[in-house]
Amino acid sequence: MRDHLEASPGLWLRRWSERDARAVLTAFADPLMREQAREPVTSPGDAERRLAGQHRRWRAGTAFAFAVVDEEDTVLGHVAVSAIDRRHSTGWVSYWTTRAARGGGVASGACRSLARWAFDDAGLFRLELGHRVNNPASCRVAGAAGFAVEGLQRQKLEYDGVRHDVETHARLATDPEPAEAGRPARPPAT
């Protein structure tokens, strides 16, 4: 199973390493990241524990997390497949980018590459992801990465006492590769 791959020219996915703790801490200092984090990352120890957990899950085969880096190995973001169900060959995709990397196609390129890796290397068939409906940028990432809209989960998430609806997307191993960045994928005809 590959742990380092080219996502697109100048963009790479590689396993997280302990040396990335500072980059993780810096990324989570962004208010947008803090707002959506399941667990706070406010100290070097928090960042180190987060990375150690990713390594444990990789070894166990329950989740595979990659740092998204440029040619100089600068961390631009994160992409992962988790909640892996081997019986049904499914997984859940998550991603984030640093403030400086947003809006440049980093997340969609990383998600496209992760999906192909999950199908080819991890043997999964179906990948799912979701985003709050008030996050149109994440919806564009999903579409550009070939994830078709499937539906709405009402009031699924709660942040600071406020419930949020989540739009769900999925991509199958049999779906065509996304034809063009920025264009939503269409589900195959049934």
Name what the model sees in each region:
Residues 1, 53-55:
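Short, P/G- and charge-enriched loop/turn segments at secondary-structure junctions
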Residues 1-32, 65, 69-190:
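Acyl-donor (CoA/ACP) binding surface of acyl/acetyltransferases
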Residues 28, 37, 58-59:
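Hydrophobic residues in alpha-helical segments
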Residues 32-53, 66:
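Conserved GNAT-fold acetyl-CoA-binding loop/helix
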Residues 42-46, 55-57, 97-98, 186:
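Juxtamembrane/interface motifs at transmembrane-helix termini
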Residues 56-61, 147:
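Short loop/turn motifs at secondary-structure junctions and domain boundaries
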